[in-house]
Amino acid sequence: MGLFDRFGERASSSAAPAAPSAPEPGSVEAIAAGNVTLLQFLRRESGQIPNRAYILARTIAQHLDDVVADPSAHLLDVGSRITLERMATTHLPDTINAYLAARTMPDADELLVEQLATLEVAASKAAA
């Protein structure tokens, strides 16, 4: 056994096991993982947003669940899957966070509901 073999062996035997990797972006698994995080976020912020907005956000999450549960979800084009993933991980949380930062502004509640209604239409079309 050469000098480099011993060091390589020692290094590999003491290395920690690899952490499970995150789902591949745009995969059905990534949509599911994003939706889990979204639901946790919604539970945490539920008392801070108007009831109508909360209902719309939960409806969007349900549409995402419907997509994930559909066995043909893997057949969606990658662009659609990435859009759905981003809806759960970015679009919806960012919309709610923007509302939370500006909720004292006039018409903030109505604007939030309007934005979430637009996202809900897109999510319902994807789930159909």
Label each PLM-derived region with a short phrase.
Residues 1-12:
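Polybasic, Ser/Thr-rich amphipathic helices
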Residues 78-128:
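Cytosol-/stroma-facing membrane-proximal "stalk/adaptor" domains immediately downstream
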Residues 14-75, 86:
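Membrane-proximal, non-transmembrane interface segments of integral membrane proteins
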